[in-house]
Amino acid sequence: MITFQEKLITAATTNRSLVCVGLDIDTSRIPCSDPLEFCRQIIGATSEFVCSYKPNLAFFEMMGTEGWALLDQVIKMVPPEIPVIGDGKIGDIGSTASAYAKALFEKLDFDAVTINPYMGQDSVEPFIAYPEKGIFILCKTSNQGSEDFQDLITSTGKPLYMVVAEKAQEWNRNNNIGLVVGATYPEELKRIRYSCPDMPILIPGIGVQGGTLNEAVQFGSDKSGRGAIINSSRAILYASAGPDFAESAREAARSLRDQINSVLHENNYDWS
């Protein structure tokens, strides 16, 4: 069976793209009455310019049972060669984590999920145990409040986010772990990439949150010019509030893909 890592690399190479479209489906903002049709058109318009999609579970959960049904349909409408990352930031004790892993990997069939490591290794192990799936561990997140805990200096003399990165390296026996690091903290991203040279890094925070694309690509990419997954949600989904929303999303995704590739080229990385 193809692994998440293999699927991600193939999609990125085929589409020459490090773009991940975040599906943060806010029903108060979508320019059509049917969320399913909105998702269908967004995915159809952008799929040739992305390496992955990332549904934000909270935006589906707030719709209740209809939202869960919608999420299931959205996952299935993504082209099978493009990986889907479930963004739930899950974290709980081992038995509960096992239930989450079964729900997200077996029932909903996500290719990867985001994980909150605050409760330690036993809360992460049930996800690692699926070697064909991927997990992205929250490391240094893009929100301003991340400084409250993630920057605290531990007994090792290192900030907590670096301890998380190093633990992720230790746990990565199945080569299926990645990290979440915000573009809003470029120096921290650079430090984490140096410590974890081969891990994929999911990078939110571009655009609306103020992250700089050049630094995200330059500091987040691995030695081959890959490894960075640049997430964009609102800037693509809501590029237009009119009936041309799908066409506008397509152009926004294409533009971001091309901007990223320009930065890669400037740093002597190419897709060939």
Predicted regions, residues:
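Conserved, mostly hydrophobic/aromatic
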Residues: 21, 53, 87, 113, ...
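Conserved N-terminal beta1-alpha1 strand-loop-helix module at the mouth
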Residues: 1-81, 156, 244-261, 265
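Conserved anion-binding
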Residues: 26-27, 92-180, 198
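Acidic (Asp/Glu)-rich catalytic clusters
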Residues: 12-14, 43-49, 73-80, 126-131, ...
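A C-terminal functional module that forms or caps the active site or interfaces directly
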Residues: 183-231, 235-236
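Active-site-adjacent beta->alpha loops and helix N-cap segments on the catalytic face
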Residues: 62-77, 93-97, 117-132, 184-194, ...
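Short, well-ordered coil/turn segments that N-cap beta-strands
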Residues: 15-19, 49-51, 80-82, 111, ...
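C-terminal helical cap(s) of enzyme catalytic domains, especially alpha/beta-barrels
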Residues: 215-227, 238-271
